[in-house]
Amino acid sequence: MPSNQTPLGALPARFRRQRLLIVGCGDVGQRVARLVPAPLRVMALTSSPENCAVLRAQGILPLQGNLDNAQSLRRLAGLATRMVHLAPPPTEGWSDPRTLALLRSLDRRAWPRSWVYGSTSGVYGDCHGAWVHESQPVTPFTPRAYRRVDAEKRLRWHGKGTGVRQGVRASILRIPGIYALDRYGGTPQERLRKGTP
């Protein structure tokens, strides 16, 4: 077996521990980390040096890196056995180069065995208030939704891969709305009560 595909059993005991990498460890990522069972080691990719102390205080190992700087992602290859990707795509364009950079960095070594990507229900487009189900075809309406569809397609393609990518379970969550409790303007319920957008 090539050295870049070393199974967990061939590693020293301290490296055999299951490891979860959260990419985009803001409010939701930190909530996910609090729900992770104890034997799993939680790491988080952060581009903010100021955020490192906050993450450490919660028992999360911070890793400095930036999805807009592919060179800073090189060390992520082979690091995690599981991954949760919650980082948003860039605010402009029709594709998601951040997810592409992350996927390319992981191609260098053994991939996480499972991966969860936080997408958006916006990939369904304007459904005019109708119910949406996950088997419904995507019909992105905005550039933001197109960027999310691009990331989903890339993740699915990589999940069906061979070699270091073989056997990766990729799950996509199409989240209808995420609102931190301390978000400017309040929660959706508070904004409805106030009559503000």
Give names to the regions the model predicted.
Residues 86, 115-121, 173-175:
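SDR active-site strand-loop-helix element
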Residues 1-76, 85-86:
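Hydrophobic, well-ordered beta-alpha structural blocks that scaffold small-molecule cofactor pockets
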Residues 57-65, 101, 130-134, 161:
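Active-site regions of enzymes building and remodeling cell-envelope glycoconjugates
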Residues 70, 91-93, 124:
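Short glycine-rich, flexible loops that bind phosphorylated cofactors or substrates
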Residues 101-143:
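Conserved Rossmann-fold NAD(P)-dependent oxidoreductase catalytic core, especially the SDR/UDP-sugar
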Residues 166-197:
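NAD(P)-dependent short-chain dehydrogenase/reductase
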Residues 76-116, 150, 154:
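NAD(P)-cofactor binding segment of oxidoreductase domains
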Residues 128-172:
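Catalytic helix-loop patch of NAD(P)-dependent Rossmann-fold dehydrogenases
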